[in-house]
Amino acid sequence: MTSLRPTRDVCMIKIDGLTKIFGEGAEAFTALDDVSLTIQSNEFFTLLGPSGCGKTTLLRMIAGFLDPTRGQLMLDGKDLLRHPPHQRPVNTVFQSYALFPHMTVSENIAFGLQMLKRPKAEIAATVSEMLELVQMTAMADRKTAQISGGQQQRVALARALAPRPKVLLLDEPLSALDFKLRKEMQLELKRLQHETGITFVFVTHDQEEALTMSDRIAVMNAGTIRQIGGPRDIYDHPAERFVADFIGDTNFLKAQMVSSTESGALVRLASGEEILAKAPEGGAHSAGQAVTLAVRPEHARLCERTDALLIGTLDNVVYFGTDTHYHVTMEGGGTFILRRQNQPGQTQTLAINDTVGVCFAPDTAQILKD
């Protein structure tokens, strides 16, 4: 497939105040609450959030399977709400691939093109191109029941890409795959998006999928968007406690504001230690105010008690192969988790119930909005 490679500063999807309310009166439920965002051309954009957050509802409205209660939805400068699903330049790949078992791989890929009444020569050329794109040429004449789950996923993608939609919608398409195959398909999806230049809108509750594949992520909760940003920005600079808690592992520490500076905020930990932490943009805190600090497990280390910011008791040590997690019960309550990457020849010298110190660079601690 020839990629047009549109620049990312061109808006493909513009959503303004989109709301979806199911039911009426006392039984009314707001699944999507005044959502606004833009998705650029040639972007891999992910809607990430827990079950029931509204991400699939939003995807279904883009596809045309649901009508919004109110709001505006534009695609490539045109009002999408005026068009039924079959007239929208989008295709959808679902969790269940919905392949036709009585058809071959090639026939499945050709089906949508046949429904669009494309010329036979064009269909044959496009099917061949799609088979090569998803690396399934050798399986062209097999029935879909004779191929693996990962191969079925590739066929579903090829069928959706064949009509050359402007936008491809993907509704948790990897959730049925095993762990190893899911990781392989993450790389495959990103490759396909890059090679085709088509805008991908991907829905998932899996943070690893979102961080691995996305150009940008919209983190959703309770029908609203809590933060939009690149994977590194979302992970390193969560806008609020929900985002910090949902994306990766995070330790939350109670602290008290001492003063604000140009480079951050001086806070006092429960241990009495004062550190200069990162403050959220636009956040205003007064001296004496209680605040919450977020510290990622990989940013902390065990250290001598004399150098420690926090003191606690080693409660558990969990080996994960590539790294080891240390669970420390802090003086005053609460658990702090540290992550250390394992190295060849590394030995474990600590024992459960040992008193340990916890250190972290102050600039890795971030004050969160509640």
Swiss-Prot record:
Chief location: membrane
Pfam families given in the database record: ABC_tran, TOBE_2
Catalytic activity: ATP + H2O + polyamine-[polyamine-binding protein]Side 1 = ADP + phosphate + polyamineSide 2 + [polyamine-binding protein]Side 1
EC assignment: 7.6.2.11
Membrane topology: Peripheral membrane protein
Keywords: ATP-binding, Cell inner membrane, Cell membrane, Membrane, Nucleotide-binding, Translocase, Transport
Record bears the keyword Cell inner membrane: yes
InterPro entries: AAA+_ATPase, ABC_SmlMolc_Importer, ABC_transporter-like_ATP-bd, ABC_transporter-like_CS, Mo/tungstate-bd_C_term_dom, NA-bd_OB-fold, P-loop_NTPase, PotA-like
Record localization: Cell inner membrane
ABC transporter domain ranges (all copies): 13-247
Annotated GO MF terms: ABC-type putrescine transporter activity; ATP binding; ATP hydrolysis activity
Amino-acid positions noted as binding ATP in the UniProt annotation, renumbered to this chain: 49-56
GO cellular component: ATP-binding cassette (ABC) transporter complex
Function: Part of the ABC transporter complex PotABCD involved in spermidine/putrescine import. Responsible for energy coupling to the transport system.
Subunit record text: The complex is composed of two ATP-binding proteins (PotA), two transmembrane proteins (PotB and PotC) and a solute-binding protein (PotD).
Protein family (similarity comment): Belongs to the ABC transporter superfamily. Spermidine/putrescine importer (TC 3.A.1.11.1) family.
Database matches in PANTHER family: SPERMIDINE/PUTRESCINE IMPORT ATP-BINDING PROTEIN POTA (PTHR42781), SPERMIDINE_PUTRESCINE IMPORT ATP-BINDING PROTEIN POTA (PTHR42781:SF4)
Protein name: Spermidine/putrescine import ATP-binding protein PotA
Organism: Ruegeria sp. (strain TM1040) (Silicibacter sp.)
